[in-house]
Amino acid sequence: MNIRLILAAAAATMLAGCSSLKDGEYNLSLVTTGDGHGSWFYKPFSENGSARSSLLAQSQYVNELRAEKGADNVILVDAGDNFLGSNATFYYDYADTLSPYLYPRLASYMKYDAVAAGHCDFEAGHGVYDRAAETFRKEGIPFLAGNVVRTDNGKRYFQTGTIVKKNGVKVAILGYTNADNAALMDKSAYSGLE
């Protein structure tokens, strides 16, 4: 899973990037989410749907943490797998294929610092993850998958990482997806990529 890489990179870079700061103690909170699979809302879309963990609940937690610690002391990243798994994702994957993708707009509302692409985010194909990547770009959120490379020119398809500045501390956030994506899904979903 991407989470280990994100955490290790963030921790290592926080330490390395402190040289220009004044001596003192700096406390940053790193909040990671992932494997949401479309659980954006509190209940599924049915009369008998029961309450569940959701992006809404995560938003409440993050807002409380920011209020307690200070917004500039909280880093919020997601490890991917958000584009499949619910009626809401199905709607944006296959029914409304022209609107900006919803998850990046929700991530913008929550003020994510970066989002990595999970392997499930590729399964619905280019139409979904390319549209989501464009929506992330418009929302100003880095969408990361540094190990996804174009087969036609060998260039990276997505950003590898980003640097955020929190309370004067520069923190690098790196994002990688499952290296076996091409073997895990239909070839058309991952066409032109390796």
Task: Describe each model-derived feature in a short phrase.
Residues 2-19:
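Gram-negative bacterial Sec-dependent N-terminal signal peptides
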Residues 19-194:
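Acidic, metal/ion-coordinating pockets
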